[in-house]
Amino acid sequence: MAIRVYKPTTAGRRNASVSDFSELTRSTPEKSLVRKLSKTGGRNSYGRMTSRHRGGGHKRQYRLIDFKRWDKDGVPAKVAHIEYDPNRSARIALLHYADGEKRYIIAPEGIKQGDVIETGAQADIKPGNNLPLRNIPTGTVVHAIELRPLGGAKIARSAGAAVQLVAKDGAYAQLRMPSGEIRNVDARCRATVGEVGNSDHANIQLGKAGRARWMGKRPITRGESMNPVDHPHGGRTRGGKPPVSPWGKGEVRTRRPKKASNKMIVRRRPNGKNRK
């Protein structure tokens, strides 16, 4: 993948860039593998806003991605197409299995049309092949990793994501996450060899607010610029207040401190200036 930078012909084009989509081989999805996708606008079933700054955006169809490949052990598949998926940053690959079934998977870096993909403990160590962590050599880069055996891929699914298998200790495998955290995962869990493709996605510049709106993202307004009736930070009085939400709630961590899987973390991710 490469990045195409626009010439500054207008204010919106200045500093804007897009993917050149050169790796794609088809523009329309497989009809049997798409489903309707309804928009919520950040509202729940009561119509109340539960997620701010969401709404609008282009219509999308959801592509059914196979995150549980264990039921295809021993069945080879050929990569029929590399396609765009509007619901994720990574590209997706359409596989045609030898038994006639078609499925989508996350497209790894380096995969191309016509490649043969395998699944199972005896599969070769090459990008796109899926096998248990206990059968993967130490030092290998993997993605689409299960947290529980047969639970489906949960970790490292976005563009450019890569996790390194650093050690094996009995029933567990140690993985170095993109954040730098090292954690134990059951060695029976499956992973796909290689890193996720489309790694240049992080370098794309939207260039204008309109492109964010096409993606369903609405503007963010600072609480300090509002009136007191709208936000605790509103009005001319400044300082003396800890940051809070519009409803007066302080900063809330998104991870429970007593989460059961904490015991699987060998080393926490580096913080602040120690992060690389």
Swiss-Prot record:
Biased composition (Basic residues): 255-276
Keyword DNA repair assigned: no
Keywords: Ribonucleoprotein, Ribosomal protein, RNA-binding, rRNA-binding
GO BP annotations, alphabetical order: cytoplasmic translation
Listed GO MF terms: rRNA binding; structural constituent of ribosome; transferase activity
Region (Disordered): 35-58, 218-276
GO-annotated cellular components: large ribosomal subunit
Pfam families in the record: Ribosomal_L2 (PF00181), Ribosomal_L2_C (PF03947)
Role, per record: One of the primary rRNA binding proteins. Required for association of the 30S and 50S subunits to form the 70S ribosome, for tRNA binding and peptide bond formation. It has been suggested to have peptidyltransferase activity; this is somewhat controversial. Makes several contacts with the 16S rRNA in the 70S ribosome.
Similarity comment: Belongs to the universal ribosomal protein uL2 family.
Assembly notes: Part of the 50S ribosomal subunit. Forms a bridge to the 30S subunit in the 70S ribosome.
Protein name per the record: Large ribosomal subunit protein uL2
Organism listed in the record: Bifidobacterium adolescentis (strain ATCC 15703 / DSM 20083 / NCTC 11814 / E194a)
Gene name in the database record: rplB
